[in-house]
């Protein structure tokens, strides 16, 4: 009998300590108190650029295996539409396959 009373009392103490009251102040990063404004930017959904043109996203480049890739010209980063990934024919074929998969998951219309 005493053991059951001790277990019940311990459970009640744990419940009181574990659940804070409604009057307590919100924590600094509390998800219920913090509000965020999300800005949705319009992005290109259809292709408008050919191989060699400057781009920002894969959706801008026309072609199933064409992606917006990064090259370095004179130490400066330049993004342009490209489909060639290597001078080796086998590696280039594998690269085009990877580009095709990347474009498939870009969800361009």
From Swiss-Prot:
Keywords attached to this entry: Disulfide bond, Ion channel impairing toxin, Knottin, Secreted, Signal, Toxin
Cysteine disulfide links: 47-62, 55-68, 59-108, 61-81
Signal peptide annotation: 1-18
Propeptide residue range(s): 19-46
Location of this chain's protein in the cell: Secreted
Gene Ontology CC, one term: extracellular region
Molecular functions per Gene Ontology: ion channel regulator activity; toxin activity
Tissues in which the UniProt entry reports expression: Expressed by the venom gland.
Origin: domain of life: Eukaryota
Family to which the UniProt record says this protein belongs: Belongs to the neurotoxin 25 family. F7 subfamily.
Function comment: Putative ion channel inhibitor.
Domain comment, as recorded: The presence of a 'disulfide through disulfide knot' structurally defines this protein as a knottin.
Protein name in the entry: Hainantoxin-XVIII
């Amino acid at each position: 009998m005493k053991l059951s009373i001790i277990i019940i009392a311990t459970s009640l103490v744990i419940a009181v300590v574990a659940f804070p009251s409604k009057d307590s102040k919100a924590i600094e990063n509390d998800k219920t108190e913090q509000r965020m404004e999300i800005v949705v930017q319009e992005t290109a959904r259809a292709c408008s650029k050919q191989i060699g043109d400057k781009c920002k996203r894969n959706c801008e480049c026309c072609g199933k295996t064409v992606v917006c890739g990064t090259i370095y010209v004179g130490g400066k980063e330049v993004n342009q539409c490209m489909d060639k990934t290597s001078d080796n024919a086998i590696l280039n074929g594998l690269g085009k396959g990877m580009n095709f998969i990347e474009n498939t998951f870009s969800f361009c219309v």
